[in-house]
Amino acid sequence: MTSPEAVDIPFEPKKILAQLPHMPGVYRYYDTAGAVLYVGKARDLKKRVSSYFTKTQLSPRIAMMVTRIARIETTVTRSEAEALLLENNLIKALAPRYNILFRDDKSYPYLKLTAHRFPRMAYYRGSVDKQNQYFGPFPSAWAVRESIQILQRVFQLRTCEDSVFNNRTRPCLLHQIGRCTAPCVGAISADDYAIDVSNAARFLLGRQSEVMKELEQKMHAFAAELKFEQAAAVRNQMSSLATVLHQQAIEVGSDSDVDILAVVAQGGRVCVNLAMVRGGRHLGDKAYFPAHVESALTLAEGGLGDEADGADGADEAAAALPGEPADEAAAARDAASAASSASSASVEAEVLDAFIAQHYLGNRVPPVLVVSHAPASRDLLELLSEQAGHKVSLVRQPQGQRRAWLSMAEQNARLALARLLSEQGSQQARTRALAETLSFECDDLAMLRIECFDISHTMGEATQASCVVYHHHKMQSGEYRRYNITGITPGDDYAAMRQVLTRRYEKMVEQAAQAAAADDAAGIDGESTRQAEASSLLPNIVLIDGGKGQVEIARQVFTELGLDTSMLVGVAKGEGRKVGLETLVFADGRTPLELGKESAALMLVAQIRDEAHRFAITGMRAKRAKARQTSRLEELEGVGAKRRQRLLARFGGLRGVVAASVEELASVEGISHALAEQIYKQLH
């Protein structure tokens, strides 16, 4: 790995490029502030990195990136496959400004069958283990819940928590309506229930005909033994399964597990539509919109063009280093241009490469990927197969049912992209309307940063404050923050608002002051990059959910911190808290403003204010529920933190502990029979 160049030393690419090896690896570009600009992988580091400094027709955006490079770091790997894996990990961890980025969505839902004697089926998100059975992943929560409803109707598996299952004395409502066989009260044997679980698992794996055939044999066997009630029950089960299969006839194909990936570029944005087929059933799709894909624009619109992140072959053709003979450098550039034209790697292929790497590496991969475009990287498929432990096939021109699925995915991608572009236009119009209403001047409205605060509590209990952020014409959920409010009189919203504003902005003001002091000491005139970064953390507009009282508190805090009070805007609720009746209250003495129901500016204010309220109240409820759940157990004599944790884990919560018998309490590790009796008496 090359040693990082110090930021204060002038960047000299010739010296750095001369030291790079002809080996596979990963390279990283940094700017003067130490921020990562780009992460890439190469079959030949020397040729790949050199191409950025020898090409004569870089797209405007890549050319701008090159001018910002102040430091280069490289990591040598044993193979290009290792470089690809390291590149993917670094892109996810560092989120470089010039890489194509997808939101790291690791929370795909699964349908879980637990390892219980009477397995429970449940909706599940998170990492999977080997103890339980997991089916999926599914594209949405709706797809999981629909599958659970189907299994309830056909196989009648239980869905109740173990703590409920262990404490039932009579069947629940689901048994009465034919959605559960009530194993909790012994209405079905463990062997018969295991058969239902096996059939349900095979159904999820796409072996429906096999299940139907076994059920038919079972029905005839019962009839031959004159067990007509059991035969009728199996017949009803077959009827339910046949109904489900008929309803899903359009969705079911011969494939078991397939993912369909359709990429569409339009209007400067790209959409990747991922459709999932599991067990032969089409489970729906999900649209992804990557960031940093300005190459979706044409060159005339300021995009990257195809050469920005082209295949290694094109870049390696331009391998002439600075200082080589001019004719050789020119020949290399001509070769690079020809290679780039020959490869003509589209933005769709680049985006597909990025999606496959970021979505599948390290996660489950189905055996077949049906794609709308051929990926640019050949090594990616080999690496996926190696990591998955099975061959992963890529189908570019599908036939039959797969072709219909791909066509549907492409259509859904176009619709999702059109909807996004429409919403973006509407949101940008709202941002512009708000800026005009508040007489706020901003050269780039996308950089307008709005923060909104709300206080939530229940009669003074579990007081929490929320801060939500609106930036780049959308809510930035990753920048949301909750603040636990302590040391105030319960129910004092003014004190809570003072505390959260002080905690939020005091540190930002200190950072800006430190940056300015450091620049003064260094003799830097004007605003340096360090000062600009510190100042960029401060919002342009601060919305306060409240009227004159809350705005006055905010004004006092901002005055104490030396901040501009003109950015403070209170949102006073109208009659009945209806949208359209709000009044904007200003901290700098401007006349309160009523905008009316049709105001685009007010729609944006209401959107941000409602999001702050939602974020605050969900946090407050979670905090309150946690406090109420644990407080009663904390009062139990003889029960410390470890025993309390074991009780909650064993019975699933306070309600399960209260419902447990003395014998069940005594079965928990660390709790004797005498202590169990004491706990039982204290809870009843």
UniProtKB/Swiss-Prot annotation:
Keywords: Cytoplasm, DNA damage, DNA excision, DNA repair, Excision nuclease, SOS response. GO terms for biological process: nucleotide-excision repair; SOS response. One of its GO terms (molecular function) is DNA binding. Coiled coil: none annotated. Its main location: cytoplasm. Interacts with UvrB in an incision complex. NCBIfam families: PRK00558.1-5, uvrC. This is UvrABC system protein C. It comes from Burkholderia ambifaria (strain MC40-6). The gene is uvrC.
